[in-house]
Amino acid sequence: PDGSIASVIDKGDGIAYANIDLSWSRKKQVLDEKVFNDRRPEMYLNLPTDPYLWNPLDFFGLYGLDPLPKGKESLVTAVQMNSSNDIKKNLKKIFEYLNKAKDSGSELVVFPELALTGHLNKNKSAISNNDSEILELADYANKNDLYICCGFAEKYNKEYYNSSVLVGPEGIIGIYRKIHLNKSDKSWAAEGDEWKYFDTKIGRVGLMIGYDAIFPES
């Protein structure tokens, strides 16, 4: 529950041993976050459909309502980078990573949470989804036939969100706003209220951000 690795077997057969403190599990915390308080049950209404028991191609193609796009094998790059509060410097660094990923043959490049705007002073650095920095990412994606997913602090309708944008050759494809907020997020951001996935020419792409991944319901 504290995020530490208790034991590892990374290859071959074996038995993993570790001493565990059961009191940690009784705290109902993960990485010092009270996860049970941060659940969003109203967002999990689709879970009883049990789609995980189906072959995805059969489930999503049922009655032709929401068929999956034709899939393909693609090279995806996940970037790890440190961001500052200087958006221009962050954007320059992002383009440097994009150039490397493009040259390696990547078709989708994923940047971290808040990569574009930084982790400090989110309200002051927040941008709208049609500001020049987002448009520059979309223009790069269009010119290089590339899909880009990038986190940023978003200002929308007088609210602030921890968001991620997906851009591609088509332009700005969509925005996902983080649904599960941790303590840091709650100090500045509003909760998102919709899961987002997007059909692209490389397949269906669903978005989550950081703390979302702690919750199996996501």
Question: Where are the regions a protein language model picked out?
Answer:
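Active-site catalytic loop in hydrolytic enzyme cores
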Residues: P1, L31-K34, I127, K155-S218
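CN hydrolase (nitrilase-like) catalytic-core segments centered on the catalytic cysteine
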Residues: P1-A16, N130-C149, A213-S218
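C-terminal beta-strand edge segments of enzyme domains
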Residues: P1-K72, Y197
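Alpha-helical scaffolding within the catalytic cores
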Residues: L57-G64, E133, D193-E194, A213-P216
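Short beta-strand segments enriched in small/hydrophobic residues
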Residues: P67-S84, K88
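Active-site metal-binding loops of divalent metal-dependent hydrolases
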Residues: M81, L114, D212-A213
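Cys-nucleophile CN-hydrolase/nitrilase-fold catalytic domain and related Cys-dependent amidase chemistry
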Residues: I87, E96-R177, S184
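Short, acidic/polar
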Residues: K89-K100, A213-S218
